[in-house]
């Protein structure tokens, strides 16, 4: 099957009332863990590359890793839909580079700009991407929190306006839209009880029937990973994610893509600091043990999210 776009994937998800998990990747172990988890669940998956991952591991390198994982799947007799996606593309040039590299989906994040500038920037990316068979995700509204180069203070966060969302999609021709309904980037999603603005989501979906909505900052922040990190020198008290039942409800209301990054980072951190600090890594084997165990922990984190929101292929 090779790499695909989100077009058919989102159409099936929308009609089926489920969402596709989009997981951030930046090395071989994460790619292996995500692909193995998706394959075991026979589920479609989106592998996405952030600005930080582009700096750390060249996008060409990451594309080859993903293609190799797909090829390994084919040789083992399994074949699932896989999308390679640019997460939070900051400008036209970055999106163009990823499109030219062979990504099948890109996100242009113009949410930091005023409405008209965001429209113009997104439309420019769409006009370049569509003739090349690439789909475009855009964003309107601002999520609080930090993710790589994306840093929005809580006071600057802004819920999505449904009127603007409708106009934005019609004027830009984007293929999916990330909206702000109360989630945030990072491991601290909520100060008090978790609350999402389903009323905004419902209104947007009414104005844009059949159109796929994206939910950023949707990690559930498993407490077992938080506990492991804190027990071995970490300091992330009170970390709180989006409960799985909230994700399932969002998936039943037009959300077709749910972004997961913090869960992967927590899984990796927990699995590295625990064996290192408890002393059961022998010096000559530490690289092998960390690489294998990191993949397994990423696999576990991804399967938890897939169970919550993914559709299972027939």
Regions flagged by a language model, labelled:
Residues 309-313:
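Short, intrinsically disordered C-terminal tails of secreted or membrane-associated proteins
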Residues 20-24, 84-85, 107, 213-215, ...:
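Short catalytic-loop micro-motif centered on adjacent basic/acidic residues
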Residues 6-12, 28-52, 60-77, 89-212, ...:
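Alpha/beta enzyme core
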Residues 1-16, 231, 273-276, 283-284, ...:
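N-terminal charge/polar-biased segments
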Residues 216-220:
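Short catalytic/ligand-gating loop segments at beta-alpha or beta-beta junctions
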Residues 230-236, 242-276, 283-284, 296:
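C-terminal alpha-helical cap/extension of soluble enzyme domains
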